[in-house]
Amino acid sequence: LAAVGIDALVVGPGSSLTYFTGAEWWLSERFFGMVLFRAGDPVWVTPAFERDRALEQIRIGDDVRAWQEDASPWRLVAGALEDRGVATGSVGIEETMPFAFSDGIAQAAPAAQLTSGTPVTAGCRMVKDAHERALMHRAAEITRRAHRAVFASLREGTTVKEARSWCATAHRRLGVRG
């Protein structure tokens, strides 16, 4: 964060959240995500009715702020920025976050300078060590094997739904979700 001049980074559901934290969450109209700071643990924001599920997913940090249906998650994000002393700082928004989410943050934290979080997220994700490259090669090989099995089973009249199901089954037989 410091290297690119960002004081905090807001990351919602998706591949970046999973990559950085291991948390797997789906995108919906209700915000779940984290605010990552230059120093210290992240602050997590979750719908109150999802708090227990969120706690199962969260492996880093224990500051979890839950919002009720009649409240604003963006006020909790703004509060986290204020609590950490960066309410007027540069706040990166993860690149796949919906506009409605970033606009909500802008409205709740008008003094914050919102900017793209891509230099942080893409900057980290594009650097691969030997272990990560080996995992990627293994995943690609598993997928090739699964596709070969499916292609061998294809016949005239096979539906897309059937092929998808066969592909998922082939991945499971190879020990992964797919």
Q: Predicted segment positions?
A:
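A composition/biophysics-driven feature that prefers long, compositionally simple stretches
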Residues: L1-R145
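Active-site cores enriched in adjacent His and Asp/Glu residues with nearby glycine-rich loops
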Residues: A3-L17, E141-G178
